[in-house]
Regions:
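Cell-envelope and extracellular/periplasmic
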Residues: 1-505
Length: 505
């Protein structure tokens, strides 16, 4: 069967290509065919061009770096055949990945409906990678239909809200086209976005593979499909009961809901087609846009891994290192969102979200260039999907402005270290902090025995905090905001919250 000459959907009309880097453009063509491509301006000026030979049914063009531009045309020739994409922009391109809080669409976010109806931003574009966990005919058809959209009235309802607010602020700040490649799935572990090579590179990843297999992950595909269908019948019925309860009883709490209809039947069955399997979605989603030329990666994930925090930083680091390999950029910036405050009504605070935040911070230190957007003053009680997505999106943009563009942008103060003076433990900070009258102190100190007690006296002195507790005569350890849910009171002079920290050595 002859191989059709065509461009990958990522390079269709309206695409955004990355500026100031070699741009990789690919598609399919018969082996041995010579492929020539170029990007031209509206008046015919050639911005970049390249040539390659198709192998194994694919071609990969390497186009020399370009400066930013709009209203361009991408033309690719194969013999007498031509593929032409119009309305091409050259600017900044970010992959937006993670789970449900990155997935939450603009139409469901605060301000979303008004923005969808009225906002026209010719500089912001997005491309939704089809959400497919199995590569089959449906996935092939969905990929063929995928396309770029520009933010304009009536559109962008299905764009990641976090990515939207990130892109809007970035476009306004640097006056450049911004392309967002949306690639996420709610309820996923970091291991879903790691391929086999990344998982097997660490003992922690290998344990996930073994555990999933032991749970039945290698069962026959047809068996998994039957179990999956039965699960969604049950899940949809449960959701319908919950929706009716909320309609009949506005303000009903989750404990009351669970008592009436029973606990949520989540999780779906394991199996070879599950989107929640280790090493799955990276193959059926992320790698469909590899090896695109990117400016950076945006990531908001971790909620699903709070029960397994002890190895999260190792896994996250391995994931990013592998993504940098796949996208052929060892210094690709990784811009992460730290989890906000959250707890379900009636739940005991087990500090698992606090531990996950600290793991995210450890990974951020190891993954330079990169940064972490601090959301310690954000989150909603009993709602794991807060609808304020402007704050995380714009704080993530501030991280990009500092890390990627070398600009001066607001940053949360951070703890740099600690030392002791008698019965006082002193924490050194990257910037001075102020204590607000509202909120909790959330500072604890401990001696060598590791028994933590609330700080009773805090003195803020420039870039130092002096902490004391009558219960700890010889302080050696300190931690801040070691809770799933709380209202913080320590902020920088720029209004951003002090980042959570723990010094236990």
């Amino acid at each position: 069967m002859a191989i059709e000459f065509k461009l990958a959907p990522l390079f269709c009309n309206g695409a955004v290509l990355c500026r100031r880097k070699e741009v990789r453009v690919w598609g399919t063509a018969a082996d041995g065919q010579t492929i020539a491509g170029r990007v031209t301006t509206a008046d015919g000026l050639i911005l970049s061009e390249g040539i390659c030979t198709a192998r194994d049914g694919r071609f990969l063009l390497h186009l020399p770096p370009m400066e930013q531009a709009t209203s361009c045309t991408l033309t690719v020739h194969c013999g007498a055949e031509t593929c032409t994409s119009t309305d091409i922009s050259v600017g900044e391109v970010y992959l937006a990945s993670g789970q449900s809080n990155m997935e939450l669409e603009l139409q469901n976010a605060d301000e979303g409906q008004d923005l969808i109806a009225a906002h026209d931003d010719p500089l912001v574009h997005y491309f939704n990678v089809p959400k497919k966990s199995v590569w089959d005919d449906d996935a092939i058809a969905a990929e063929a239909a995928s396309h770029w959209e520009r933010v304009r009235p009536g559109y962008a309802r299905d764009m990641s809200a976090v990515a939207y607010f990130f892109a809007r602020k970035l476009a306004r700040t640097i006056d450049c086209p911004i392309g967002i490649i949306d690639c996420y799935w709610g309820g996923t572990s970091v291991t879903c976005w790691m391929d086999k090579e990344a998982l097997e590179a660490t003992a922690e990843g290998q344990r996930y593979i073994t555990r999933y297999r032991e749970q039945g992950g290698d069962k026959p595909f047809d068996q998994w499909r039957q179990e999956e269908d039965a699960f969604w019948v049950e899940m949809n019925a449960w959701n319908a009961h919950v929706a009716q309860l909320k309609k009949d009883n506005p303000g009903i709490s989750w404990p009351e809901i669970n008592e009436t209809v029973g606990p949520c039947p989540w999780h779906p069955p394991v199996g070879p087609g599950s989107p929640y399997r280790p090493g799955g979605l990276i193959e059926t989603m992320t790698k469909r846009v590899v090896p695109a030329t990117l400016t950076g990666i945006l990531y908001y994930q971790g909620e699903d891994d709070t029960a397994k925090t002890e190895h999260y930083d190792v896994l996250l680091t391995a994931m990013v290192m592998r993504l940098r390999q796949l996208f052929r950029d060892d210094s690709l910036p990784f811009l992460n969102v730290q989890l906000p405050m959250w707890i379900a009504a009636g739940d005991e605070d087990k500090h698992d979200w606090a531990r996950l935040r600290l793991a995210q911070a450890r990974a951020a230190s190891a993954l330079q260039p990169g940064g972490l957007a601090i959301l310690l003053d954000c989150g909603e009680f009993d709602n794991i999907h807060p609808t304020d997505k402007r704050t995380p999106g714009e704080r993530l943009c501030d991280v990009a402005l500092r890390v990627v563009y070398g600009m001066d942008a607001p940053e949360s103060p951070r703890a740099l270290g600690k030392y002791t003076q008698g019965d006082t433990l002193v924490v050194t900070l990257s910037a001075p902090v102020l204590r607000r009258e509202t909120g909790e102190l959330l500072l604890e100190i401990a001696g060598e025995d590791g028994a933590y007690h609330p700080v009773q006296s805090v003195t803020l002195d420039g870039t130092e905090m002096r902490l004391r507790s009558v219960a700890v005569l010889h302080p050696a350890k300190v931690r801040y905001a070691y809770v799933n849910w709380g209202k913080v009171s320590l902020f920088g002079r720029n209004g951003l919250p002090l980042a959570p920290f723990a010094f236990e050595g």
